């Protein structure tokens, strides 16, 4: 005869809760997900939103643990990602992963024809000079270095083409076309497509910030002064009020940091002699001969 041990109902409320490092909420273990590589644990909802955001924005292909202080610097495996996102998001993740593999593979390159987008194989990987590459899909023959139509006996142009329009090959690239929907990053030359939004662009590959219209660097232009003058004036794509609010926030951050430094400077001046005195005493104690 088997007996079942009775468990009081009030014991159910004493089940341990686990804290999520993302939302700081406490949840039962059943609502948590553990990353296999580093054993960090988060609530399933937060981890799912984190993974979906990175994939939708195309920020990362190797999705790292959300904990910045993770001792093992773990990453989510593909099967873990597949269990928590929808099929279309997983398809986008695999596409981004493949694009990154081709980008860093010296044996492969993309066909520059905007209507093709096939992956082409380089014949001689060890060859340092430009070589002809023929796309097996559209049969276009192009240069492995500048991606223009193959030019035997001629060097590559000094200025690499940076924009092109849909339906055109790299031989018909536009150099100063403001309305071109696809351009190259001025720094790493990766193709970037802009559907809509503001003209301040950031390359997802090298994190370089630049103006979409003139390709000038915006890495140090925190206040977006570039759009107050010149040919790109008022082309940012945001209202004047939002630009003023952005500048107010940036100035506030710098002013707050300066104020903090100003308040802390007297304490630093007072503490400096004390620190120097302690160091002198320590060095003097090390130099004293040992008693015999």
Swiss-Prot record:
It is a single-pass membrane protein. Pathway: Protein modification; protein ubiquitination. Zn(2+) 4 binds at residues 185, 188, 203, 206. A zinc finger (RING-type) spans 20-70, 185-214. Its main location: membrane. Changing residue 252 to L: Preserves membrane localization but is defective in self-association and ubiquitin ligase activity. It catalyses: [E2 ubiquitin-conjugating enzyme]-S-ubiquitinyl-L-cysteine + [acceptor protein]-L-lysine = [E2 ubiquitin-conjugating enzyme]-L-cysteine + [acceptor protein]-N(6)-ubiquitinyl-L-lysine. Zn(2+) 5 binds at residues 211, 214, 226, 232. Zn(2+) 1 binds at residues 20, 23, 43, 46. Its EC number is 2.3.2.31. Coiled coil: none annotated. Keywords: Cell membrane, Cytoplasmic vesicle, Endoplasmic reticulum, Endosome, Membrane, Metal-binding, Repeat, Transferase, Transmembrane, Transmembrane helix, Ubl conjugation, Ubl conjugation pathway, Zinc, Zinc-finger. Residues 16-236 are annotated as: TRIAD supradomain. PROSITE patterns: TRIAD (PS51873), ZF_RING_1 (PS00518), ZF_RING_2 (PS50089). The active site is at 198. The chain crosses the membrane at residues 250-270. Zn(2+) 3 binds at residues 143, 146, 151, 156. PANTHER family: RBR FAMILY RING FINGER AND IBR DOMAIN-CONTAINING. Self-associates. Interacts with UBE2L3. E3 ubiquitin-protein ligase which accepts ubiquitin from E2 ubiquitin-conjugating enzymes UBE2L3 and UBE2L6 in the form of a thioester and then directly transfers the ubiquitin to targeted substrates. Mediates the ubiquitination and degradation of the DNA damage kinase PRKDC during DNA damage. Positively regulates DNA virus or exogenous cytosolic DNA-triggered innate immune response by mediating STING1 ubiquitination and increasing its 'Lys-6'-linked ubiquitination and translocation from the endoplasmic reticulum to the Golgi leading to downstream signaling pathways. Members of the RBR family are atypical E3 ligases. They interact with the E2 conjugating enzyme UBE2L3 and function like HECT-type E3 enzymes: they bind E2s via the first RING domain, but require an obligate trans-thiolation step during the ubiquitin transfer, requiring a conserved cysteine residue in the second RING domain. This is E3 ubiquitin-protein ligase RNF144A. It comes from Homo sapiens (Human). The gene is RNF144A.
